[in-house]
Amino acid sequence: HQVVPTFLLWRLHNNISVMHRLGTERQFGNILEAARSEKDWKNVRAYLNMFNEYSIHLNHRQKEQTISFLYELLLNREGDIRRQAAALIGKMFADFNAGYRKELPKNMPDPDDKTALTLWEEYLGQLVCPDYRLTIQQKHRIQNALKFIMVSAMERSSEKVREELFTVFVKWFDGHHRLVGDPVFYLLDCIFSLPLDLCSKGDRLEQLIRFAISHMDDPDEKVQIAAVRVLKVLTQAVPPESACYEIACDAAHRINPRTITLLFLQYRIYTNLRLDTTAQREVLYGHDVVSDIFLENLKSATPWILKSVNIKLLADQVDHGKRDHLLHICAHFSNLIKVSEQVGVRHDAGRALLRLAHLLTTDQRNEIAVELLKGLEVGEYEFSKYIPEYLGEFALWLPPEQLDDIIERLHILLANGNERIVSVALDTLGVLLECYSRYTVRFHESEEVSEERRMKLLGLILSCLANYREQVRQEALLVIGQHIFGSQILAERDKSRMFSLCAKKLLFLLNENKGGELSLYYRAATLSHIDRFIAHYQLFGGLVETSTREKIAFFPGTFDPFTLSHKGIAKKIQELGFTVFLAIDEFSWSKKTQPHLVRRQI
């Protein structure tokens, strides 16, 4: 009865600590300066998580300062940081005027709306056409963030705000801006990423189609591909009676299919427009085109957008029954996840691999999973940090014996001396636990065995909260917050069951190793996820309960972890179904002298 209120009160205590730091201009400025001076991307992520949780409580001036800081982060060399910063910019614009505000008289225009839209227009200009003093690579990083900002803003904003923000964005396609090269490419890439229903409202559809068609003959190959790719998406919303149907058909006929990639896009456009696709089908599915695509995708000179389309082309080959190269295609996708320079290509390859996983045989699945696992063990975090998201889901296609083997190897990696390897192993366990409910549908096991494996995964994650390295503890906090209690995939009843089992242990471990300033931000974010879960479950599911210990045993005297007989006795009692409590007194052990607090940690 005390555990749940304690979590809520402790979350309140952490909120007060963080809000106190955000409350005054001086302290808020100090936080931004500390975040700007951080070199380690994981520490930067702690600040981003904190802003993500508390940005709605900031005043307008603080929001402007935060958006300015996030814009600077778009230059960061870490793709994950750029993506997270971009999504947060979109969220802050969507919620710019949200929160508790004074009620205005009727018919009085809101001056804050004008401020938000003016700021939005200003930043759109800086995103599409960055400062000329930046290097080409820095400009590309900023321009590439445009789509993540737009998608985040459109997803999170209300209908009224969404229309206002999108209306400002669409002005870039009215023909008044003389755009060439990269700005055109990234605008087209942004349109490709946005919801189709938003792009097809009113006369926007024709405007966007004309913009795409006008750049189909661009001398730059990547702009051509981007324009045709946008046309492929927009033609899904063009019925035969539409005013722009003839325009789209004429443009589709004008596409020069000089490469297999352009031919594939033309085939998809013809399909959307209900045109005859016999000639395209003959080339695509009548000949072996897979080996040429493999070669093209592994070339560093190939534009990333070409690789992205080729990934869909390879998956399409399998969908049309060409299974001869299935293992090679999946192995190719796993290689792209591990070595591709462009983050977007890695995610496209990962999604395609998961889509085809069910077609592989057991041996083939195991082969791919082992290759991905080897990628974790490399220790090059720049390459391995994108693997957990896909290895965690892919491993759930393995039969029980092989899945247990993967979990055991991840368990071994948690003891690695390299913090980066521990972090990716921990992330993989988080994804495994988050998606584990799918496993019981694919492989029939007794409920007892299935539940035991789930508890093992949870136990491995919790064990990292007791790690002696603060960075590992922070990663464990992140996994518990995002992959368990903040998950959109896990069912509420599964969260409740896990909470009832780990609540007391979690409460103790969170309080035991409080860490420094950055750990406060990680802990506050995790407690926010737990608090939201508790509130949601109590509102719709009933009371959140914690499990009680039926059989308890106290180990007499001082427990010595360096003595195998002590450990053996404790394990034996535990196997009998008892929860064993160990005592550590103030005196040193006889075999290995250590200070009291160090022994407590062990």
Could you tell me what each predicted segment is?
Residues 2, 37, 41-42, 79-80, ...:
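Alpha-helix N-cap/helix-start positions at coil->helix boundaries
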Residues 4-8, 43, 47, 85, ...:
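Conserved hydrophobic register position within alpha-solenoid helical repeats
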Residues 12-13, 51-56, 89-97, 146-153, ...:
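Hydrophobic residues within the alpha-helices of tandem HEAT/HEAT-like
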Residues 15, 58, 77, 96, ...:
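Long alpha-helical scaffolds in large eukaryotic adaptor/regulatory proteins
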Residues 20-29, 59-70, 112-124, 158-169, ...:
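Core helices of alpha-solenoid repeat scaffolds
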Residues 28-39, 68-75, 109, 121-133, ...:
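HEAT/HEAT-like alpha-solenoid repeats
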Residues 245, 249-282, 289-295, 299-316, ...:
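Core solenoid repeat modules with strong leucine/isoleucine-rich periodicity
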Residues 447-448, 454, 458, 470-473, ...:
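Nucleotidyltransferase catalytic core that binds NTPs
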